Amino acid sequence: MEYMARPVKPNGAVAERNPERTRERILSAALQEFAANGFAGARVDAIARGAAINKRMLYHYFGNKEHLFREVLRRKITERQASAEGLSGDPAESLPFWFKLSCRDADWVRLLEWEALQEADNPLIDGAGRRALAIRALGRIRQQQALGYLAGEFEPRHLLLAMRSLTMFPMAFPQLARLITGQPVSNPHFQKKYAEFLKKFAAAFQSAGGRRNKTNFEN
């Protein structure tokens, strides 16, 4: 029977043997490290320290850094989808919702920014799975256009891209938002006013009559 050393905490104490709790600690520490430094800059030893385990134990749970990053992405996507359960597809509701979520979930925005900086010319990690989610989102938009809930003259891919941009740009480029508006994006007044703007601006996406239906545009 193979012997596996019990993980050691930074203070020298032996960590408790609780696989699920250990896994959660690893994912939490990995999210912080990937959000701070990106995939290329993240250090496995820093993640292990943050999770209060040794590197051997980390590799036992996730195999390698790429597998760990894939699991962090999968978990964040699942969390975001769960938070939108029951959300109406009416852009007047969904656009403010996704903007507010971006304000609360800065780690997600940072993950995407680091990925754009470091991996733009490389195949995306879990690219096939993420592309499948985007295709599903496009299918829902096309369905809503066919039913008359969204204006049919818009190219669905451009429509989805525009909606994502509107809800994430201020958090992705806070310095530009501050230059334009004179307010930091962390300012509750800015967030309130921009959410109100998105609700009004949403009418531009709707077909005449502005009928509503329940759809989730987030992938």
Labelled PLM ranges:
Residues C103-L124, F173-T181:
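Amphipathic alpha-helical segments used for helix-helix packing
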Residues R75, L111-E115, A162, L166:
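Short acidic/histidine-centered micro-motifs embedded in hydrophobic/aromatic stretches
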Residues M1-P10, F97-R104, I135-L147, S165-N219:
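C-terminal peripheral helix-coil segments that are non-catalytic and often amphipathic
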Residues R25, E93, F97, L111, ...:
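Amphipathic alpha-helical interaction segments
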Residues R25, A29, E33-H67, E71:
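Helix-turn-helix
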Residues Q81-E85, D121-Y149, R157-H158, K192-E196:
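Amphipathic alpha-helical packing segments from all-alpha helical-bundle domains
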Residues R70-F97, A128, A134:
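Amphipathic alpha-helical linker/stalk segments
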Residues A36-A40, D105, L147:
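Short coil/turn segments at alpha/beta junctions that flank glycine-rich nucleotide-binding fingerprints
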